[in-house]
Regions:
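Conserved catalytic core of nucleotide-sugar-dependent glycosyltransferases
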Residues: 1-77
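C-terminal catalytic/acceptor-binding lobe
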Residues: 63-64, 68-150
């Protein structure tokens, strides 16, 4: 395992944002803008690249990192700092302690989530379903209506 081979404290795999699959959830911190900016290209000859921040979805962290945050900074590791989310806040603390993080960018994971699905009466011709004749009543105007829905 790379974490052991290179004696690293933090290693993340690579995965994409749920809503932007073309953007990886790994960042470098831009000191000028004070923003975490996504990394879009990786050196194909390297197993690992240093990162400033990453999502926690494929993250390996040594226990000693959490212990140092609590004992040296007196803060919970993932407590939000200002407008930053939990993940960026965690990595801001590790940078403050001089702990480097790396991305094993060839280790890729999927970003799980949920998707709201709404019914659509406009079925494609390839949809397999059974047509039923039903009788209904009521319209949005309050008038009675009878008919069949196919």
């Amino acid at each position: 395992m790379m974490m052991e081979r290179y004696k690293l404290d933090i290693v993340t795999g690579l995965y994409a944002y749920k809503n932007h699959p073309e953007v990886a959830v790994v960042h470098m911190f831009n000191e000028e803008t004070k923003r975490h900016e996504p990394i879009s290209r990786f050196d194909e000859n390297c197993e690992l690249v240093e990162v400033s921040s990453a999502g926690a979805g494929a993250l390996l962290v040594r226990k000693s990192v959490y212990e140092r945050i609590v004992t040296e900074l007196y803060e919970p590791p993932f407590q939000v700092i200002g407008a930053y989310g939990e993940d960026h806040s965690f990595f801001m603390r590790t940078r403050k302690l001089g702990i480097k993080a790396y991305c094993a960018w060839k280790v890729q994971a999927t970003h799980l989530g949920y998707k709201a699905v709404e019914f659509s009466p406009n079925l494609s011709p390839n949809t397999i379903c059974t047509d039923y004749t039903v009788t209904g009543f009521g319209t949005t105007k309050g008038e009675q209506q009878h008919g069949n829905a196919n």
